[in-house]
Amino acid sequence: MNTVLGKAMVVLSAFTADDHGVGFAELQRRTGLPKATLHRLLTELVAVRLLDRDDSRYRLGRQLFELGMRASVERGLIEVATPFMEDLYERTHETVHLGVLEDSEVVYVAKIGGHRQASSPSRIGGRMPLHCTAIGKALLAHAPDELRSQVLTGPLPRRTPRTITAPGMLAKQLDAIVEAGVSFEFEEAAVGIVCVAAPVLDASDRPIAAVSATGPITRFRPQAHATQVRAAAAGISATLARRPRTESHTP
């Protein structure tokens, strides 16, 4: 592997489950990398917390553990959500998304759509702002007060002429979303695209994810599908709640 990423993977793969700390010389023996290259990679991997360094010895970092746990959580979430998303797609015949909250953005982790799917800007693994997407607003409405305040006091970038950029207007929408259990987006993230979303909540009403149906404004009426989207989100929430704790959304 001649790429930087490939070489970084060689270094990470050189560690075993039994390693409690590996020295530079042993890592060079295991990887076969030149000293200068290995030193640079180790420095960068420590900087991003993929490796920890204790004196002159290295071990796998906590960030790797956190990434692994996140991947496991998302796989379980997607496994539970998929049947409900497929049913929602059959009912709406429009693009169905599943998104999760990460930092101050929504990350799309699953997407179902047929040949009629809208030309939405979303993609699996892609990120979008919270304030201009139906999924983002559904998540933000149920997010901790600290995050809501952070978003409302920060800049609200305009993506289209219909993007909400006034904090007061967004705050009123978020309160209404909590009451209604559903959020809407009307050409706020992309011109010509409308969306309806509902939050997937845990037993404490904290947001686990949100599910949505998205379509072109020329044929899709979000309000007409609000009940179906809300039912899909409720079904995902209920199914997650019945799963053993080791398989649920929380470690």
Could you tell me what each predicted segment is?
Residues 1-78, 237-242:
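N-terminal helix-turn-helix
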Residues 98-103, 112:
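Short hydrophobic alpha-helical segments used for membrane anchoring or interfacial signaling
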Residues 147-158, 234-251:
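Cysteine/selenocysteine-centered motifs that mediate thiol-based redox chemistry or coordinate metal-sulfur cofactors
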Residues 163-239, 251:
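Extended hydrophobic
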